[in-house]
């Protein structure tokens, strides 16, 4: 340990002695006057690096397109993925731009009044009526189709009304004084006759028979 201490002190003295300026001769001064002065300026990145070592570090992780300034962010985060990220970002931006152009082209072909003109019902109409008997009911299907338009766009409105009625029915119409008609539908039965028969025994005889205790029934007790 003593040897190391002595060596350290000796090295320190040598360094201090070497750091002090020495005496300059007059000849050396004259030679230096004849030599042209060359000014060497440090690069911008070196200045930024030296300034960043003494300034407060920037903790922002946002990417800037102005320039690649050196800061603590570039020191802590490697830049080997920046090229891949910029390529992916540019590809996504180009794809979104293409989609916007396609949507703008599609929307530009739609007329100002819209695809369907709701203020006007098409004049041309095709009406069909179909009647079927299903499970004892008469089913009538009335379908009306309105079509209008051109080769670019067209309007189609289809109205279907389904009417279901019993197969056998009677319609009675009553017209009131106010010219309003009320329709009353009463179902009728065809081919069925209801007949009532009177029982040969009266109610009193049936009740007496129900309350009578049979003589033949009884409990048999055996010892």
UniProtKB/Swiss-Prot annotation:
Q: Which UniProt keywords apply?
A: Allergen, Glycoprotein, Secreted, Signal
Biased composition range(s): Polar residues = 186-203
| Entry superkingdom | Eukaryota
Expression by tissue = Expressed by the venom duct.
Source species, please? Apis mellifera carnica (Carniolan honeybee)
Q: Which stretches does the entry tag as region Disordered?
A: 186-223
Q: Which cysteines are joined by disulfide bonds?
A: none
Secretion signal, residue range per the UniProt entry: 1-19
Sites carrying a glycan are 126, 142, 168, 193
Location(s), subcellular = Secreted
This entry carries the following GO cellular component terms, namely: extracellular region
Provide the protein name: Icarapin
Q: What is its main location?
A: secreted
């Amino acid at each position: 340990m003593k040897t190391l201490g002595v060596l350290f002190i000796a090295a320190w003295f040598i360094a201090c002695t070497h750091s002090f300026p020495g005496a300059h001769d007059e000849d050396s001064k004259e030679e230096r006057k004849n030599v042209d002065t060359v000014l060497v300026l440090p690069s911008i990145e070196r200045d930024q690096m030296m300034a960043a070592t003494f300034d407060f570090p920037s903790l922002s992780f946002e990417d800037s397109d102005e320039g690649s300034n050196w800061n603590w962010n570039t020191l802590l985060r490697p830049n080997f993925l920046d090229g891949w990220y910029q390529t992916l970002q540019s590809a996504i931006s180009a794809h979104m731009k293409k989609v916007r152009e396609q949507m703008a082209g599609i929307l530009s072909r739609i007329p100002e009044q819209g695809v369907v003109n709701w203020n006007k019902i098409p004049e041309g109409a095709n009406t069909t009526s179909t009647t079927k008997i299903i499970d004892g009911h008469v089913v009538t299907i009335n379908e009306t189709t309105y079509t209008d338009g051109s080769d670019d766009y067209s309007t189609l409105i289809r109205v279907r009304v389904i009417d279901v009625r019993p197969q056998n029915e009677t319609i009675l119409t009553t017209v009131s004084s106010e010219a309003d008609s009320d329709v009353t539908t009463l179902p009728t039965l065809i081919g069925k006759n209801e007949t009532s028969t009177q029982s040969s025994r009266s109610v009193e005889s049936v009740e007496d028979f129900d309350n009578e205790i049979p003589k033949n029934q009884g409990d048999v007790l055996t010892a």
